[in-house]
């Protein structure tokens, strides 16, 4: 769901725009009010926004579910999903960010493999030194295995399970003025 939510934010798409709610059947709010609200939310979507949202997983069944959910959200043409091991992650982009919810290793038998995954993430992500990373996990020693202390850490709950959002901030990309943007647009043609 992270790539789907990222695309919705990038397109300025209201959450739940494609869903129905019990409140839509309340007698004291007419159907017209809900229709008008949906129409207004739809008019605010930026359909031509340039997005580069990608989702990776080593589990093909997880990717299949993600593709189905992207289609249900009307975003199948805005997202790219691919089966890929974390070891293969790279990018030519100088700036970007990664939001990930890796396995937590809640079962004792998974603990060692998850800790190995966190070490591998630390190695791979360190090569993307101008990127920012946002990692959600319940593992209390995540930073030790990742090899770096987070710039910020926020407590979250995934249902009843306490997790933490570890935030690692990269540098901000340089600002481009309108002249540079126009120049780049000409070069890209």
Predicted feature locations:
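Conserved S-adenosyl-L-methionine
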Residues: 1-90, 106-107, 111-113
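Conserved Class I SAM-dependent methyltransferase catalytic core
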Residues: 50-52, 56, 60-65, 69, ...
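Residues immediately flanking
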Residues: 86, 102, 138-139
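Conserved catalytic network of the ASCE P-loop NTPase/AAA+ motor domain
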Residues: 90-92, 127-128
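Short SAM/SAH-binding signature in class I
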Residues: 95-101
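Cys/His Zn-binding finger modules involved in RNA regulation
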Residues: 183-185
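RNA-binding accessory domains that recognize and position tRNA/RNA substrates
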Residues: 187-189
């Amino acid at each position: 769901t992270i790539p789907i939510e990222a695309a919705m934010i990038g397109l300025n798409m209201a959450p739940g725009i494609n869903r129905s709610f019990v409140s839509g059947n309340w007698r004291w709010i007419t159907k017209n009010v809900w229709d008008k609200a949906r129409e207004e939310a739809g008019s605010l979507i930026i359909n031509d926004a340039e997005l580069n949202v990608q989702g990776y997983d080593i589990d093909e069944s997880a990717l299949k579910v993600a593709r189905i959910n992207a289609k249900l959200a009307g975003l199948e043409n805005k997202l790219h999903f691919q089966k890929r091991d974390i070891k293969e992650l790279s990018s030519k982009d100088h700036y970007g960010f990664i939001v990930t919810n890796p396995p937590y290793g809640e079962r004792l038998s998974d603990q060692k493999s998850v800790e190995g995954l966190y070490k591998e993430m630390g190695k791979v992500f360190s090569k993307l030194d101008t990127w920012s990373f946002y990692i959600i996990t319940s593992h209390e020693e995540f930073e030790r295995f990742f090899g770096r202390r987070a710039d910020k850490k926020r407590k979250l709950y995934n249902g009843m399970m306490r997790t933490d959002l570890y935030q690692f901030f990269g540098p901000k990309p340089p600002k481009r003025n309108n002249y540079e943007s126009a120049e780049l647009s000409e070069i890209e043609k």
